[in-house]
Every structure is written in structure tokens, then in C-alpha cells.
From Swiss-Prot:
Keywords: Late protein, Virion
UniProt subcellular location: Virion
Induction: Expressed in the late phase of the viral replicative cycle.
The name this protein goes by in its record: Uncharacterized protein C717R
Organism, scientific name: African swine fever virus (isolate Tick/Malawi/Lil 20-1/1983) (ASFV)
SUPFAM superfamilies for this protein: Protein kinase-like (PK-like)
Record family assignment: Belongs to the asfivirus C717R family.
Length: 717
């Protein structure tokens, strides 16, 4: 172990604040060993460092190209390329088709360009036949690549035309996705048009692809660079993902205004990321940064819901012009009385700007919608992963991760997710304790005996510690675009925006809360909707804790739905995976207890009494009672190897929002002190200058905002 790694481990353990907690035997049992660093939360600390120093981005000034393939009347985008200002060579590439989503377009495999192109060049000779096939299809006009550049840049267009970069990026994307198809690990919500393109292209490229995988197994390690920017040792690196959301004029102008969904999501993502780096919870992606992309229009996006946004923008602009001309196309008298300034303000919430926000975060694995198919079909997963759907302790570990994530979200952040469907929950296969040999499916090596993770969930420490089997990763919660902000945020909001804003914010949110309740519990609102909304507005402090049950109910209901999928109960799948009835019963039990908590406490609130506890305070000890440290026999505890600990009692001392608030193990001065003579560039090849520029004051962003303001004022809308 290097001096730097040893120091990071010691600092991480120190920050867990485990000293003088519980009995001597408990403290001894809970001790983390340096030899297990590779499997501990230190690797998430390392992931934070790699994301921050390996993927720095200024908050504006990028040109982005979206690459499309057109083949046999089907088109799909498959990658993005990013240039920083007017640099000739790209800075980043993202080799991935988009995922189907409502609020933005997500892709993973966002990587630094330099290791990407170095890796491709290293294997290009072995790909000659595949490149030739693609070029012949282009020459025959059966296949075409189409490029859209935002904002348009002639230099970048010429650069792509004079190189074979588009071809290289397509083949890199193709190799990664065909590898996932071979492994049966392709996500079910990947763009369907892209999957059709691959299916239609397969007869043309099948022989060349199979020959490459068979004859060049020694080169497969280079493909890691296409996924996470690493090399042969890069499998320990995190993958980075991008989410791009088109912004309305108001969203583009009012940066960090959490009354707007996109900024509310950014805020919550940053706060949840801080839960990870402070050793409180592993259940969220690490937030990297956000940047504005300019010149974006509907051509950039593929998802239907985003196309609808641009259609509404067109309609709103046309209606606005008619109103201002005085044409009587609307019957609302009050609306007609609005001033031009008022109309423009209202329009700014509907009209699309030409700006999109790109958010980069740690990629946290397969969604639970995809997980059953992956586990039941893939021959390369270790039994530890497969057991998530077969072994009770493994399944309960995944279930607890998700419930604990909801618990800390409610208690630490005063936020309810409110949209925990199967594509907003993931299994993150990270720092595994078992390793498979790609050449010998089904053969694996276990590096640690009986690995477990401990979760300290309250101030009583020892009696509130849960112990779970390590499942070569953990469950994660993503996408906070429909989250509910609790009453504790009111003081901060009032300080920033004033009391009138706070009242408007919570009044608007009450409509969203009713919509969520209407979706999950329609019977609850029967003849009581006005009464419930009145309580939300007048006594939200009492009401919030009662509706934390929503997230536990959604977790249980959707996991039960996942386990009940018809194909999991076919004879073919049952040969590989046998779903236990116990799992279904556990989910149903959690579901029922969540409903019981909600209805009981709703009655309490309507009676004018406070609800002191959140759903997690009540449900965790009931559902996971057997996994509490005091309830586990001592001989069983002694057989466990504790490889990680998370401590709810930690405060959020550190934050990823600014350099000054980074943890010690992410501070450049501290890192170099323990680097044994290595330079910053030796550790982080991007270099310190690139990182500092990304965090410097960005005057270019101010120019974008000024341009949007002028556009809004001058369009006479």
C-alpha cells in the first residue's frame, strides 16, 4: 500500500467518528483493517477525487456535437463530442446512446478524450476489417453518419470531416454495447431506435466483431478507456455519466432557484453527494459539476417528452404574438389585462431558451428495471450478484440500502424523493469482493470471507447498528426532479428570496404533493382533498413526516412488481434464478406497514397533533429487526469481516460544492504532502491548471445570461 493510500484510509476512518462509540467489544468488532481498503468506502473517496480532478468543466464555453447513425430508415444518436471554447481537439467524448427519460437525456461513458483516443489507436489495427465494412456501407449509401454542432462551428465541422473520429467513436460505442449484449447486461430503457439499428447492422458486422473478440482477447482491456477513461487497471475507476436538460428562459436565468425543478434537482444531488463523502450513506451518486451548453434546439434531443417541450414553446410564442397584437383569441379577461412585462414574465416559464444544462455525476449502475434480466441471463456475474434474487440476506441488503437512502434523505436533507420507480433505483456493482474470469464463465474468486457492511442509524449506536451481507455493491437512489422539499428549507429560502417567495413555493408544492398522493393512494383523497391541502398549507411541519411513507411504499411496491415479472417465473429463467416467496412477502409487509404509517399519522395531523417520527424511524426496526447488531448471535458476528461502515450520526463537515470545503483527502496540498514526491500531474493527468480554471470566476456565463435577458426583452413576445 502506498503512503498516499494509507493516509487516505486513515483519514477516511477518522472521519467516520467511530471512536468511543458503543461497548469495547462492539468497537473492536467494528474496526476497519487497512488491508481491506480496496473494498471500503475509501474507494468512493477515490471516485470523488477522480471525478473532480479528472472531469473538471467550466460552467460555460463548450461546443457540443451530437453524432447520429442513419441505417435502413432508422436514425439514432450514439455519442456526443465536447470542445472547450475554440480548441481544435475535443476535450470529452460520451460514447453512448441516450436512455429513455422524461426530464432530460442521460448517457454514461462520459470520458476524457485523450485516454479514449490513445486506447482506440492502440487497437485500431485489429479493427481494420470492421472499419472497412462500415466504410463500404457508407460508400453504398446504406449507412450514413450525421453531425449536428451546437453552436455551429465551422472549424469543428472541418476537424470531423478531415479525421475518422466519428467512425472511431461509433465503433467504440458499438464494441461496448455488443459486449453488454454478449453479457446480457444491456439496460432495458436504452433508446429503442438505437437497439433496432444494432439489430439491423448485426448481419453485416457479425463475423468481424466475433473475430475481434475471439482473436484479440489481450486487447479487451483497452475498452475500459471507452467506459471510464482508464486503462488496464482502470476498472477501479468510477464511470461518469451526463444528464442534459433543456432549459426554459426562466430556468436559464434564475441559476440555483430551487423553485424551478431543474435547480431543485441540482441542489438535492449536491446535498446527497455530500452524504457519501461524509461517510453517512453510500446510496447516492457523487455529484461532479454542471455546465451550460449554448445554441441547443429540439434537434439535439430524441426523447418524446423533450420534443413536446419544444412544441409547447412554439405554441406559446405564437399565442403571445397574437395577444400582444390585441387579437382576441383568448377569453380570459384577467389575462388580457396583463401588462407586456407581466406577459413576458409568465412566458419565461414556458418558452425554451437555446441553453441546456449538462450535469455530470458518478454512474451508479444498472436500474432495477434492468437488473432481473441481467441477473437471470448473464453468465459472467458472480454468485454474489446472482444471489441478490435468490438469497434472503443478499436481497435484504439491497432492500435496506434503498430504505436507508430514503431514511437519510428524509432525516438529513428534509426531502422526499416522491418518484421511486424502478428506473430511479439502481444496483451499483462497485468495489466487488469477488472476481470473475471472462474466459471461464461461472468461475470466480472470493477475496474476502463473509464480507459485511455496518450501518449506524442513530445516536444509540450499538443498538441502532444494522449489519448486512456485502453484495459486491449497493443499491442507489437517483433522479430528484420530482422531489418534495420539507419545511426545514423555509428559513433558508426566506433568507435568500423573502417570505412572499416561500409562501408561493410551498403553495405550488402542495399541488405536487396532492398529485403524488393521488397517484399512490387515490382512496385517501376521496372527499378529503381540500381538507388535506389545507393542512399542507397551514401545518406542513406536522404533515411532512407523515408523507415520508410515500418513498418506502414506492420502494416496496416497485420491488414486488420487479420480482413478479412474468419472465422471471418461466422454466428457462428458473434454471438460473429461483425467486423466493419470502422476498415478495417482505416487500408486501413493508408496503402494508408504510400504508399503515401514512394513514395513522394523517389522522393525527388532521386532528391538529404533530407527527414526531419519520416513516424510517418506525419501519426500519420492524422490517430489518433480525439484522440489528444485538440480534445477531456472537459466533455469527465473529465470522464476519467488516469491510465498510456508514454512520448516520456524522455531520456534513465537507462538501463537493467548492474547493475550500473539499475533504482533506481531496485537498491538493494534503494530497501532495503524502504523494512521496509524485507531482499533481502524476496523480491526476489532467493537471492542476485545468482544474483551477474550471472553478475560476466565469465571465462567459454572465454574457450568456445577459444575451438571454436581451433576447426576452427584444423579441416583442
Amino acid at each position: 500500500m502506498t503512503k498516499l493510500a494509507q493516509w487516505m484510509f486513515e483519514q477516511y476512518v477518522k472521519d467516520l467518528n467511530l471512536k468511543n462509540r458503543g461497548s469495547p467489544s462492539f468497537r473492536k468488532w467494528l474496526t476497519l483493517q487497512p488491508s481491506l481498503l480496496r473494498y471500503s468506502g475509501v474507494m468512493r473517496a477515490n471516485a470523488f477525487d477522480i471525478l473532480k480532478y479528472g472531469y473538471p468543466m467550466q460552467q460555460s464555453g463548450y461546443t457540443v456535437a451530437t453524432l447520429e447513425i442513419h441505417f435502413k430508415n432508422i436514425r439514432s444518436s450514439f455519442a456526443n463530442i465536447y470542445w472547450n471554447r475554440d480548441s481544435e481537439e475535443p476535450e470529452y467524448v460520451c460514447c453512448c446512446a441516450t436512455y429513455q427519460s422524461h426530464d432530460g437525456e442521460y448517457r454514461y461513458r462520459f470520458v476524457w478524450y485523450q485516454p479514449f483516443i490513445e486506447a482506440y489507436n492502440a487497437i485500431e489495427t485489429a479493427l481494420d476489417s470492421l472499419e472497412t465494412i462500415i466504410l463500404n456501407l457508407i460508400a453504398a449509401r446504406d449507412l450514413d453518419f450525421v453531425v449536428h454542432i451546437f453552436p455551429y462551428n465551422k472549424g469543428h465541422e472541418d476537424y470531423l470531416a478531415s479525421t475518422q473520429l466519428i467512425l472511431k467513436i461509433f465503433i467504440a460505442t458499438l464494441l461496448m454495447d455488443i459486449l453488454r449484449i454478449k453479457d446480457n447486461t444491456l439496460d432495458v430503457h436504452l433508446n429503442s431506435d438505437y437497439i433496432i439499428v444494432m439489430e439491423r447492422l448485426w448481419p453485416h458486422i457479425k463475423d468481424a466483431i466475433e473475430q475481434f473478440f475471439e482473436a484479440h482477447k489481450d486487447l479487451l482491456g483497452y475498452l475500459i478507456a471507452f467506459r471510464n477513461g482508464g486503462n488496464f487497471a482502470g476498472s477501479l475507476r468510477p464511470s461518469c455519466g451526463q444528464k442534459i436538460v433543456p432549459l426554459t428562459i426562466r430556468e436559464a436565468l434564475q441559476i440555483n432557484d430551487i423553485n424551478l425543478a431543474v435547480w431543485r434537482e441540482v441542489f438535492i444531488m449536491q446535498e446527497c453527494s455530500d452524504l457519501v463523502i461524509n461517510g453517512i450513506a453510500p446510496c447516492f451518486p457523487i455529484f461532479n459539476t454542471w455546465t451550460y451548453l449554448q445554441g441547443i434546439n429540439q434537434i439535439f434531443f430524441e426523447n418524446t417528452s423533450l420534443q413536446e417541450k419544444f412544441k409547447k414553446d412554439f405554441i406559446a410564442r405564437e399565442l403571445s404574438k397574437e395577444i400582444i397584437k390585441g387579437q382576441k383569441i383568448l377569453n380570459d379577461i384577467e389575462f388580457k389585462k396583463l401588462s407586456l412585462h407581466q406577459i413576458q414574465y409568465m412566458e419565461s416559464f414556458l418558452l425554451m431558451s437555446d441553453v441546456a444544462i449538462m450535469i455530470t455525476t458518478e454512474y451508479v449502475g444498472y436500474t432495477l428495471q434492468s437488473l432481473p434480466g441481467i441477473i437471470s441471463r448473464s453468465s459472467y456475474l458472480s454468485p454474489i450478484v446472482k444471489n441478490i434474487l435468490m438469497d434472503e440476506d443478499s436481497f435484504m441488503s439491497l432492500l435496506f440500502d434503498l430504505c436507508y437512502g430514503a431514511y437519510v434523505l428524509h432525516k438529513k436533507e428534509n426531502v422526499i424523493h416522491a418518484d421511486l420507480h424502478l428506473n430511479n433505483m439502481t444496483y451499483y456493482h462497485f468495489n466487488p469482493t469477488s472476481f470473475t474470469d471472462r474466459n471461464k464463465p461461472g468461475k470466480y474468486t472470493l477475496k474476502v470471507n463473509n464480507p459485511v457492511i455496518a450501518f449506524i442509524t442513530g445516536p444509540k449506536v450499538e443498538t441502532e447498528t444494522y449489519v448486512f451481507k456485502h453484495i459486491d455493491g449497493f443499491g442507489c437512489i437517483i433522479d430528484f426532479s420530482r422531489a418534495i422539499m420539507g419545511p426545514n428549507h423555509a428559513i433558508k429560502l426566506e433568507r435568500q428570496y423573502g417570505l412572499a417567495f416561500v409562501n408561493t413555493f410551498y403553495r405550488n408544492q402542495s399541488e405536487h404533493i396532492l398529485k403524488v398522493l393521488r397517484y399512490y393512494f387515490p382512496e385517501m383523497l376521496t372527499n378529503r382533498e381540500n381538507e388535506i391541502q389545507g393542512v399542507i398549507l397551514s401545518n406542513f411541519n406536522f404533515f411532512f413526516n407523515s408523507i415520508t411513507a410515500i418513498d418506502f411504499y414506492a420502494i416496496a411496491r416497485n420491488l414486488r412488481s420487479m420480482l413478479s415479472l412474468d419472465y422471471l417465473h418461466t422454466s428457462e429463467v428458473k434454471r438460473n434464478v429461483e425467486i423466493s416467496q419470502t422476498f415478495l412477502d417482505t416487500c408486501q409487509f413493508l408496503e402494508e406497514k408504510a400504508v399503515e404509517f401514512l394513514f395513522k399519522n394523517l389522522h393525527t395531523v388532521l386532528s391538529g397533533k404533530p407527527v414526531e417520527k419519520t416513516a424510517g424511524d418506525v419501519l426500519l426496526p420492524i422490517v430489518f429487526k433480525k439484522f440489528l447488531y444485538p440480534n445477531i448471535p456472537k459466533n455469527i458476528l465473529r465470522s464476519f469481516t467488516v469491510i465498510d461502515v456508514y454512520n448516520y450520526n456524522n455531520i456534513k463537515r465537507y462538501s463537493g460544492k467548492a474547493i475550500q470545503t473539499f475533504p482533506p483527502w481531496a485537498q491538493t496540498k494534503e494530497i501532495l504532502t503524502h504523494a512521496e514526491g509524485r507531482t499533481f500531474e502524476d496523480i491526476f493527468p489532467r493537471g492542476e491548471l485545468v482544474f483551477k480554471k474550471a472553478y475560476a470566476e466565469n465571465n462567459y456565463l454572465d454574457k450568456i445570461l445577459q444575451r438571454i435577458r436581451e433576447q426576452l426583452a427584444n423579441e416583442n413576445l
